[in-house]
Structure formats: structure tokens, C-alpha cells
């Protein structure tokens, strides 16, 4: 992504500036946060992941773009304080919603995926 944006590996300031765009929801007009009760384990965390995937697919069907942002979990204390969430809640992620900027170079990125048969076995 950084190469696509013309940000050299050694330009730490530019890399940090790009990362910080997470915390502006990449300019999206709408966003939300997802919390999980601290007592919940991996099954409930995966439930939330499946819910988010479904939400993202439904948003796409409605002509909207989304970006799941795990980066927000690093800001748990700040977000929890601002939203006045309970002590039992832990921030899982944020998600921004809107229409992608077709002119933004970063939105042309299509990361390579390993072929299905290299990571999945069907029996």
C-alpha cells in the first residue's frame, strides 16, 4: 500500500500520517464501533466477525462501501471513555461506511490472495 502511495519505507512520518487516517475514518461520513463483553471468548468474537462480514456484504448490496478497522482497538481507553461504555466492554473494531473515492490511489489496491487450495482443505 505504501509503495502504491509513493511512500518510501524509510519515510516514517509519511507512514504514520497514513496510519492516522484510520482515526479519521478515512473521511467516511458515517462510522460505528463494535464492543464485546470481556467475559466472551473466541466463539463470540468470531460471531461478531461473521456479523460484520454480513453487514459489509449488505452495505455493498445497497451501494455503500465499508472498511473494518481493527486499528481502533488500540484506542480502546479513549473510545470507551468518549462513548461511556461499561468496564465490561472491550472495543473490537470500528467500521466506516460511505462511498469510496474512486480517484484516491489507495482505493485501487487489490492485495494478492493465496489460492484457496493452499490454505483450505475440503473433505
Predicted regions and their residues:
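Acidic, surface-exposed loops and disordered segments
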Residues: 1-123
Amino acid at each position: 500500500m505504501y509503495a502504491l502511495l509513493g511512500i518510501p519505507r524509510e519515510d516514517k512520518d509519511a507512514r504514520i500520517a497514513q496510519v492516522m487516517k484510520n482515526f479519521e475514518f478515512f473521511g467516511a461520513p458515517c462510522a460505528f464501533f463494535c464492543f464485546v463483553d470481556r467475559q466472551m471468548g473466541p466463539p463470540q468474537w468470531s460471531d461478531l466477525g461473521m456479523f460484520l462480514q454480513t453487514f459489509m456484504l449488505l452495505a455493498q448490496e445497497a451501494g455503500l462501501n465499508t472498511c473494518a478497522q481493527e486499528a481502533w482497538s488500540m484506542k480502546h481507553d479513549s473510545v470507551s471513555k468518549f462513548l461511556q461504555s461499561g468496564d465490561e466492554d472491550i472495543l473490537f473494531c470500528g467500521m466506516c461506511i460511505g462511498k469510496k473515492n474512486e480517484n484516491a490511489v489507495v482505493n485501487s489496491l487489490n492485495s494478492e490472495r493465496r489460492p484457496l487450495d493452499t490454505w483450505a482443505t475440503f473433505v
